[in-house]
Amino acid sequence: MLNTDGIVIRPATEAELPLLEELARRIWPDTYGKILTPGQIDYMIEMMYALPVVQKERAEGVAFELILDGEKPVGFLSYGPYKDEPPTMKLHKLYLDFGYHGRGIGSMALQHAIAAAKRAGCRFLRLNVNKNNAAALRAYQRNGFYQAEAVKVDIGGGYFMDDYVMEVKL
């Protein structure tokens, strides 16, 4: 059911960047609680969402956008340049409060990222998704993404990201 009334996607301001970590701490246990250990969840949130990390990525051209229900932040996404040949954008993050799943908002956010990639002249939009995140895999496939490769990335601390790399041709 598509119910995106009142949902807005807009760039996060500098002052709102700390919200990304807050949202991740709220959303990740529902998303990854049956896939990753609590220790790995904490490690990855600190590694990816600490304010200096987000500020550095933003300075490198990564866009951070909030998904709002009215004024209430309910999710976020980030995307940015990936490689020049062929021109490809990377969707780094897309997370939505569990209570907002199944309403078409994730697809709305994906289409938003696809439109940004097209505006940037990209031919592909690429992302990584945990191999065991069945709901996300289905959502990406419904939006035209296909599996390009499988990767296992050592992220330090004794943890790995065991992902599929998916992409959509634009």
Regions found by a protein language model. Name each.
Residues 88-89, 123-126, 130-137, 141-143, ...:
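C-terminal "cap" of GNAT-fold acetyltransferases
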Residues 2-7, 11-17, 21-100, 107-112, ...:
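Acetyl-CoA-dependent GNAT
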